[in-house]
A protein has these predicted regions:
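Anion-recognition interface
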Residues: 64
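Accessory alpha-helical/coil subdomains and C-terminal extensions
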Residues: 22-23, 31-36, 42-57, 74-224
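Glycine-rich nucleotide/cofactor/substrate-binding loop typically near the N-terminus or early
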Residues: 1-27
Length: 225
């Protein structure tokens, strides 16, 4: 859905809903399947309420498809798209880890997921990554870039203690959703936002950003990685 539907049916908002349902009535649409994630399911709920309020006999059905895996489905079932995204992401992550091991380097990669860390965690777990950073880790403390960098540095140091001079970290893009405006401004990140008010994270190279900051911190600590 390219446009977020208003939460009520009053005034001009009602006109918008009437325009949508005029199309349904014109083509006698009685079954409407909407495939998507959180915003799409929100749209399904609003259209269903309007159909019930206006007495239009229609079945509006939401099909939960999102790689974020953040829709509460019965029996904790994963959303459509999550497992395939995790599998494909794991293929890439394994290749990155092989490169790290054979070259003696550390690499940082990011995974999609908006405000949820399921995809990053699933990929990292499948590939036994030594460091996985997801927003859910910070449920009792504000997320800051410094904390994320400290986590990665600690993983590097711990592996060096056991003579493992390589590794990889996967970071969920969701951490960007939880950063304060002051934190974002201090690091020079400027987001554009979509019609639903979500930052367009695809336009920012998260992995390169954290890799650059990690390099700076390691240089300050005189750790040659």
């Amino acid at each position: 859905c390219r446009k977020k539907l208003p939460p009520d049916f009053d005034g001009e908002h009602r006109i918008l809903y009437e325009e949508i349902f005029s199309v349904f009535r014109e083509y006698d649409i009685r079954y409407f399947f909407y495939i998507g994630g959180n915003d799409s399911m929100d749209t399904v709920a609003k259209l269903s309420r309007f159909a019930a309020e206006t007495g239009y006999d229609m079945r509006i059905i939401g099909v939960p498809k999102t790689i974020d895996n953040d829709l509460p489905l019965p029996d904790c079932a994963p959303t459509f798209g999550y497992e395939s995204a995790k599998d494909k992401g794991a293929v890439i992550a394994r290749a990155v880890y092989v490169d790290a091991r054979t070259s003696g380097n550390w690499f940082v990669m990011s995974a999609m997921g908006r405000s949820a860390g399921h995809l990053a965690f699933g990929i990292g777990e499948a590939c036994h990554y030594p460091m996985i950073v997801i927003p859910e880790m910070f449920n009792k403390t504000p997320i800051t870039i410094d904390k994320i960098i400290r986590l990665m540095v600690s993983s590097i140091v711990k592996r060096r203690i056991v003579s493992m001079d390589y590794g990889a970290a996967v970071i969920s893009e969701g951490v960007f959703h939880e950063l304060s405006e002051a934190e974002l401004s201090s690091c020079g990140i400027h987001f554009t936002y979509d019609a639903h008010g979500h930052p367009e994270l695809g336009k920012v190279s998260k992995a390169c950003f954290f890799s650059m900051l990690l390099d700076q911190r390691l240089a300050e600590l005189k750790l040659n990685v």
